[in-house]
Protein backbone atom coordinates (compact mmCIF):
# COMPACT_ATOMS: atom_id res chain seq x y z
CA UNK A 1 0.00 0.00 0.00
CA UNK A 2 1.11 3.54 -0.69
CA UNK A 3 -0.20 6.89 0.50
CA UNK A 4 0.89 10.47 0.92
CA UNK A 5 0.63 12.43 4.15
CA UNK A 6 1.28 16.03 5.09
CA UNK A 7 4.92 16.50 6.11
CA UNK A 8 3.91 18.60 9.11
CA UNK A 9 0.92 16.40 10.07
CA UNK A 10 1.36 12.69 9.26
CA UNK A 11 -2.21 11.98 10.36
CA UNK A 12 -3.57 14.00 7.39
CA UNK A 13 -3.72 11.96 4.18
CA UNK A 14 -3.28 13.90 0.94
CA UNK A 15 -5.23 13.81 -2.30
CA UNK A 16 -3.69 12.82 -5.64
CA UNK A 17 -1.36 15.49 -6.99
CA UNK A 18 -0.47 17.04 -3.63
CA UNK A 19 3.13 17.07 -2.40
CA UNK A 20 3.70 15.19 0.83
CA UNK A 21 5.68 12.44 2.50
CA UNK A 22 5.25 9.01 0.97
CA UNK A 23 4.30 6.23 3.35
CA UNK A 24 4.23 2.52 2.57
CA UNK A 25 2.73 -0.49 4.32
CA UNK A 26 2.74 -4.19 3.55
CA UNK A 27 4.46 -7.50 4.22
CA UNK A 28 7.63 -6.23 2.53
CA UNK A 29 8.03 -3.35 5.01
CA UNK A 30 10.27 -3.74 8.04
CA UNK A 31 8.78 -3.93 11.52
CA UNK A 32 11.39 -1.60 12.99
CA UNK A 33 15.06 -0.78 13.35
CA UNK A 34 17.19 -3.37 15.16
CA UNK A 35 17.64 -2.40 18.82
CA UNK A 36 16.46 1.15 18.15
CA UNK A 37 12.93 1.70 19.46
CA UNK A 38 13.21 5.51 19.20
CA UNK A 39 14.12 5.37 15.49
CA UNK A 40 11.39 2.77 14.92
CA UNK A 41 8.77 4.94 16.62
CA UNK A 42 9.79 7.94 14.49
CA UNK A 43 9.64 5.97 11.22
CA UNK A 44 6.61 3.71 11.77
CA UNK A 45 3.05 4.58 12.70
CA UNK A 46 1.08 2.46 15.16
CA UNK A 47 -0.83 0.88 12.26
CA UNK A 48 2.33 -0.10 10.35
CA UNK A 49 2.87 2.76 7.89
CA UNK A 50 6.57 3.41 7.18
CA UNK A 51 7.49 7.07 6.62
CA UNK A 52 10.02 6.97 3.76
CA UNK A 53 11.40 10.48 4.22
CA UNK A 54 10.67 11.23 0.56
CA UNK A 55 8.54 14.17 -0.50
CA UNK A 56 6.62 13.10 -3.58
CA UNK A 57 3.30 13.31 -5.32
CA UNK A 58 1.11 10.55 -6.66
CA UNK A 59 -0.85 11.33 -9.82
CA UNK A 60 -4.37 10.13 -10.60
CA UNK A 61 -2.97 7.07 -12.43
CA UNK A 62 -0.97 6.04 -9.35
CA UNK A 63 2.47 7.04 -10.64
CA UNK A 64 4.83 8.36 -7.96
CA UNK A 65 7.10 11.36 -8.60
CA UNK A 66 9.76 11.85 -5.93
CA UNK A 67 10.50 15.54 -5.48
CA UNK A 68 12.81 15.86 -2.50
CA UNK A 69 13.92 14.39 0.80
CA UNK A 70 11.91 15.70 3.76
CA UNK A 71 15.11 16.78 5.48
CA UNK A 72 15.97 19.03 2.49
CA UNK A 73 12.58 20.79 2.46
CA UNK A 74 12.65 24.45 3.50
CA UNK A 75 9.99 26.22 5.55
CA UNK A 76 9.79 29.75 4.14
CA UNK A 77 7.19 32.03 5.66
CA UNK A 78 4.91 29.09 6.44
CA UNK A 79 5.27 27.51 2.97
CA UNK A 80 6.94 24.20 2.21
CA UNK A 81 9.62 24.94 -0.38
CA UNK A 82 11.46 22.21 -2.27
CA UNK A 83 15.01 23.13 -3.34
CA UNK A 84 14.93 20.61 -6.20
CA UNK A 85 12.09 22.53 -7.87
CA UNK A 86 14.07 25.77 -7.61
CA UNK A 87 17.20 24.04 -8.91
CA UNK A 88 15.32 22.69 -11.94
CA UNK A 89 14.11 26.21 -12.76
CA UNK A 90 17.63 27.64 -12.42
CA UNK A 91 19.09 24.87 -14.60
CA UNK A 92 16.85 26.19 -17.40
CA UNK A 93 19.02 29.33 -17.48
CA UNK A 94 21.36 28.98 -20.47
CA UNK A 95 24.47 30.14 -18.54
CA UNK A 96 24.14 27.81 -15.53
CA UNK A 97 26.38 24.74 -15.37
CA UNK A 98 25.64 23.63 -11.79
CA UNK A 99 23.38 24.81 -9.00
CA UNK A 100 22.70 23.86 -5.42
CA UNK A 101 19.94 25.52 -3.34
CA UNK A 102 19.88 25.46 0.45
CA UNK A 103 17.95 27.30 3.14
CA UNK A 104 19.56 30.16 5.03
CA UNK A 105 18.30 31.85 8.18
CA UNK A 106 15.80 34.64 7.61
CA UNK A 107 14.58 36.64 10.63
CA UNK A 108 11.18 37.28 9.01
CA UNK A 109 10.48 34.11 6.99
CA UNK A 110 12.37 31.52 9.04
CA UNK A 111 14.33 30.32 6.03
CA UNK A 112 15.00 31.69 2.56
CA UNK A 113 16.42 29.91 -0.48
CA UNK A 114 20.04 30.65 -1.38
CA UNK A 115 21.43 29.48 -4.72
CA UNK A 116 25.07 28.54 -5.20
CA UNK A 117 25.78 28.64 -8.93
CA UNK A 118 28.67 27.62 -11.15
CA UNK A 119 28.35 29.30 -14.51
CA UNK A 120 29.33 27.77 -17.84
CA UNK A 121 32.72 28.74 -19.23
CA UNK A 122 32.56 32.14 -20.93
CA UNK A 123 29.22 33.11 -19.38
CA UNK A 124 28.69 36.69 -18.24
CA UNK A 125 28.37 37.19 -14.47
CA UNK A 126 24.85 36.63 -13.15
CA UNK A 127 23.29 38.97 -10.59
CA UNK A 128 20.61 38.12 -8.06
CA UNK A 129 18.22 40.57 -9.77
CA UNK A 130 18.83 38.97 -13.18
CA UNK A 131 18.31 35.48 -11.76
CA UNK A 132 15.09 36.55 -10.02
CA UNK A 133 13.82 38.09 -13.27
CA UNK A 134 14.60 34.83 -15.08
CA UNK A 135 12.78 32.79 -12.43
CA UNK A 136 9.68 35.03 -12.37
CA UNK A 137 6.77 32.93 -13.62
CA UNK A 138 8.78 29.70 -13.40
CA UNK A 139 8.49 29.29 -9.63
CA UNK A 140 6.20 30.73 -6.96
CA UNK A 141 6.99 33.95 -5.13
CA UNK A 142 7.43 31.99 -1.89
CA UNK A 143 10.12 29.89 -3.66
CA UNK A 144 12.06 32.87 -5.04
CA UNK A 145 15.81 32.81 -4.42
CA UNK A 146 16.74 35.53 -1.91
CA UNK A 147 20.53 35.13 -2.09
CA UNK A 148 22.98 34.11 -4.79
CA UNK A 149 26.62 33.10 -4.60
CA UNK A 150 28.61 32.49 -7.76
CA UNK A 151 31.42 29.96 -7.44
CA UNK A 152 34.17 28.62 -9.66
CA UNK A 153 33.39 25.16 -8.23
CA UNK A 154 30.69 23.68 -6.01
CA UNK A 155 31.60 21.18 -3.27
CA UNK A 156 31.04 17.55 -4.12
CA UNK A 157 30.86 14.29 -2.21
CA UNK A 158 33.49 11.56 -2.80
CA UNK A 159 31.21 10.04 -5.45
CA UNK A 160 30.86 13.34 -7.32
CA UNK A 161 27.41 14.49 -6.19
CA UNK A 162 26.85 18.12 -5.22
CA UNK A 163 27.18 18.43 -1.45
CA UNK A 164 24.45 20.46 0.23
CA UNK A 165 25.86 19.32 3.56
CA UNK A 166 29.15 21.12 2.84
CA UNK A 167 27.27 24.30 1.86
CA UNK A 168 25.14 24.17 5.03
CA UNK A 169 28.33 23.80 7.08
CA UNK A 170 29.92 26.80 5.33
CA UNK A 171 26.80 28.89 6.01
CA UNK A 172 26.77 27.76 9.66
CA UNK A 173 30.40 28.79 10.06
CA UNK A 174 29.75 32.12 8.32
CA UNK A 175 26.80 32.85 10.63
CA UNK A 176 28.83 31.89 13.72
CA UNK A 177 31.68 34.19 12.67
CA UNK A 178 29.25 37.07 12.11
CA UNK A 179 27.44 36.57 15.44
CA UNK A 180 28.24 39.15 18.10
CA UNK A 181 30.34 38.09 21.08
Task: State where each predicted segment sits.
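Generic structural signal for residues in well-ordered beta-strands
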Residues: 2, 99, 148-150
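AMP-binding/adenylate-forming catalytic core of the ANL superfamily
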Residues: 26-32, 39, 55-143, 152-155, ...
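Conserved beta-loop-beta connector loops within the AMP-binding
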Residues: 1-23, 42, 60-61, 124-128, ...
